[in-house]
Amino acid sequence: MRKYVIPNMRLGATSFLLHETYVPAVRFAAERCDDVALLLVEPGERNEYLATPGEIVEIGRIIAGERATLHVHLPTDADFDTWEGARSMIGKIRRVAELTGPLDPHSFVLHVDFPSLHGTGGEPSAEQQEWTAEALREIAACLPAPERLAV
């Protein structure tokens, strides 16, 4: 398959273009685009929805073979409303970072969320800001390079 070409731009796509498991979905995107977003947004309670180590190896082969780049979207199934939620998020992200590290993603995208503030127009409290800043420091420290964290 020939990649889509847009002059002076790199075309990107998510690993959810197909309703498929990780490997065929990444293959589909990498065959067509320059950059693939590996979406690992809901790992599950026991990481049962994450790609397996074998799938990660195959994803690495696909990305290299297609000369594509890759970035990872980190879990979103926890939040920063409470310190407990932030701690849960750190644990999930640490597991994803360990799993995907061999892929050498150029960035790890984190969506910082405060569900208690949805629709209120409110800002995070000073306490929420404090534990979020601490969580972000811990998250950045578990990545292959802290500057790869994109918030």
What spans do the regions from the language model cover?
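Active-site acidic/histidine proton-transfer and metal-coordination neighborhood
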Residues: 64, 81-151
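N-terminal pre-domain/capping segments
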Residues: 1-95
